[in-house]
Amino acid sequence: MVAIGWLIFVIWLSQPWIHQLSQTTGVIAAYLIIAGIAYLPGYISAFTLTSLLLDKKAELPTANPSIPITILIAARNEEKGIGETLEHIARQEYLGIIKIILIDNGSTDRTVEKARQTAERTGLSLMILHEEIPGKHNALNRGLKEVNTPFLITLDADTFLHPSAIRFLAAKLQISGPDVHAVAGSLLVQNNRGSFLARVQEWEYYLSIASIKRMQSIYQSTLVAQGAFSIFRSDAVKAAGGWPDSIGEDIVLTWKFFENNGRVCFEPAAVAFTEVPESFIHLIRQRKRWARGMIEALKQVSPWKIKDPTSRFFTGLDLVVPYIDLAYTFIWIPGLFLCAFGYFGLVGPNTLMVLPVTLIIFYLLNLYQKRLLGQLGIHQKKSFIGLLGFIFVFQMIIAPVALSGYAEEFFKQKRVWK
């Protein structure tokens, strides 16, 4: 209701802007333009802010489960990081049995040898499988056939776990109802001292992605149990048919849970450190995959097929995301340049009404994250330049890239994973 009230207020406040813009575009076009760059982003921001304010304070989970768990790691040429990934698993403060299944997906380096050596040195229970058909979903489904534990975790081969990560993730799933099919872990950036792009993404993971997941989890409708680090009920994954043949296999599987009347949560205390792209070309490829994955989910699991109203609401919001990206790319960015020449019809003072709400969200989440991560003994020094890049530049890069990803999926172009 607060978000709707904010939307009504902004529409009322924007009437002079509508009047000015409609002189050039017409009334209907003016409303459509302003909806893409102000109304819809403002509504989503107000909804997020209100939800976070109503949420409980950050507390570490107290349960200490001992349920047997299987970790699936799909790997292709991960010689560089697989040893350290396994070493972090060996340091877990978890009382239960941890089985690890490494699925080699056609590696041409020493990934398997390195993994076997590390497992022998650390005493890990490691099974190595081989799946020659390329594709992460093929590798994960090959490993799924060997899972005989109630819970399973997917972990990327270059992702390092905090010592309490598995305990907190398993505790969240254990105390949740049987209709909670998965819990997403919290990802922070591992290579945060790398390139400028890596420092920008550090803030994106720390603030933006965390705030969205935490907000969605309040309603048990986290839209992505990411493959990099999430826990699942094994029988729920099998009932959903395993991971689909999609470039966004984790997104589509999550939505399959919704279709099967399941729910998905997020545990902010279950922290893992992942490696983000440092080069522009790798970042573009990653974000195209994410954009295509969202469209795949919308096509394979339409929001109107989901019975639960909250999950239907959140998946339905993704229907307007391409429109927001379109408006940002072709209206907001050109509008900024026009501001320099004194034309404020597209972007001006009224447009900036969205910015304070967004900054308040980031400020509140920063306080939440600092308190929570402080309890875990995690203290990362973050780049101020990266913060400025995240707030003022990053979306200008990501929105056009997302549009190209949508287009690639629409025209069924070849999928590129790396």
Regions found by a protein language model. Give the residues of each.
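Catalytic donor-sugar/metal-binding loop of nucleotide-sugar-dependent glycosyltransferases
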Residues: 245, 254-272
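N-terminal signal-anchor transmembrane helix
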Residues: 21-33, 42-97
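Short aromatic/hydrophobic "clamp" motif used to bind/position activated sugar donors
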Residues: 152
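A conserved acidic beta->alpha catalytic loop
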Residues: 104-112, 133-134
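Long helical/loop segments within the catalytic core of UDP-sugar-dependent glycosyltransferases
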Residues: 50, 122-123, 132, 137-139, ...
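Membrane-embedded multi-pass helical conduit in multi-pass membrane proteins
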Residues: 11-42, 48-53, 63, 321-411
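Short beta-strand/loop segment that forms part of the nucleotide-sugar
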Residues: 97-106, 129
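Acidic helix N-cap motif at the loop->helix transition within catalytic regions
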Residues: 83-84, 109-118, 140, 164
